[in-house]
A protein has these predicted regions:
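Non-heme Fe(II)-dependent double-stranded beta-helix
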Residues: 10-50, 57-187
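Histidine-centered catalytic micro-motifs
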Residues: 186-193, 271-274
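Active-site region of the double-stranded beta-helix
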Residues: 168-170, 190-193, 204-213, 220-222
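Short conserved micro-motifs at the rims of enzyme active sites and ligand-binding pockets
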Residues: 228-229, 276-278
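Double-stranded beta-helix
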Residues: 208-271
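A short hydrophobic beta-strand segment most commonly corresponding to one strand
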Residues: 200, 280-292
Length: 292
């Protein structure tokens, strides 16, 4: 399959200024109110059903965020200094010059954490996310991380919210920690398949501008079948991957700027992507995937 960026695809208009502020405000809810108020809880669930994405402000505590950041910084420091003796006993290390596992399913089903460094594709295709470190099952790296991550994810509450929103019981399938370090080669707008699937993203670091590499989303695209079929026909004709949203002309996308501790929750059937970063930018996000 070819990359959607190698031929003429149609991208959405990325909102900015007051238009972006208004669009994001309509899907934003204080986490404390969603917890305490049934009215706010229902409003958040309904917004997720309608728009495919919401932002819960202030979902994680500063203490949990600081502890996660400190432990991950120490872990990366050990890898960069080639001090791997302890890590190799508790995790699979997929380093740029030494790969021990291949394939998403093997990462997801691994019996221990997988620290996967994404690298440029050998065939030159775009969308590699080179420069990203994707840690599968980070909660298993230590008991402290396990507790802190569980505290940040609020899985029981999110499962109840997803039940009200989608009328389906969703289960946790995989937890990840995304560490983006100057990622320039991001995948264009796409969906994660056509089955019902949600992800929560807890921002461990602030994402204040496009250079930070925010999560971008076309509101309502999870329900707009016309957009999907238009892209599907184009993809088949041009040998693109089946899940690329290649024909998004006439649509608008939002970039989710957020503070550390905010949680974004989105339907992965919708058109989404990560914005390319500045070469020196850093972004850390805790991710949870929910499926039936």
């Amino acid at each position: 399959m070819l990359s959607s960026t190698t031929i003429a695809t149609k991208k959405p208009v990325l909102l900015g200024g007051e238009a972006l502020a208004n669009a994001v405000a309509s899907i934003s809810f204080p986490f404390s109110e969603v917890v305490q108020s049934q009215r706010s809880f229902i409003a958040a669930a309904w917004a997720l059903r309608r728009h495919g994405i919401i932002c819960l402000r202030g979902a994680a505590s500063n203490q949990d965020l600081t502890s996660i950041r400190d432990e991950i910084d120490n872990l990366l420091g050990n890898i960069e200094s080639n001090d791997l003796s302890n890590l190799q006993d508790i995790a699979y290390l997929n380093l740029p010059n030494h790969r021990v596992l291949k394939g998403y399913n093997n990462f997801r089903d691994a019996d221990r954490p997988v620290i996967n460094y994404r690298v440029k594709r050998p065939d030159g295709r775009t969308g590699s996310d080179a420069g990203m470190i994707d840690i599968f099952h980070p909660e298993r790296l230590s008991s402290n991380l396990g507790k802190r991550i569980q505290d940040c994810l609020h899985e029981k509450l999110i499962q109840r919210l997803l039940l009200v929103s989608s009328l389906n019981q969703m289960k946790v399938k995989c937890r990840n920690l995304y560490l983006n370090r100057g990622v320039l080669d991001t995948r264009s707008y796409h969906c994660d398949g056509r089955s019902l699937k949600f992800k929560s993203f807890v921002y461990i670091s602030d994402v204040n501008e496009l250079n930070d590499g925010p999560y971008c989303y076309v509101k309502g695209s999870h329900r707009r079948r016309g957009i999907w079929w238009r892209s599907a026909l184009f993809n088949k004709k041009n040998q693109l991957g089946p899940f690329e949203f290649s024909q998004l002309q006439g649509t608008e996308a939002i970039s989710l700027f957020a503070k550390a501790g905010d949680m974004v929750l989105s339907s992965q059937k919708g058109a989404h992507c990560g914005h390319p970063q500045h070469p020196k930018a850093k972004r850390t996000v805790l991710v949870n995937m929910y499926q039936r």
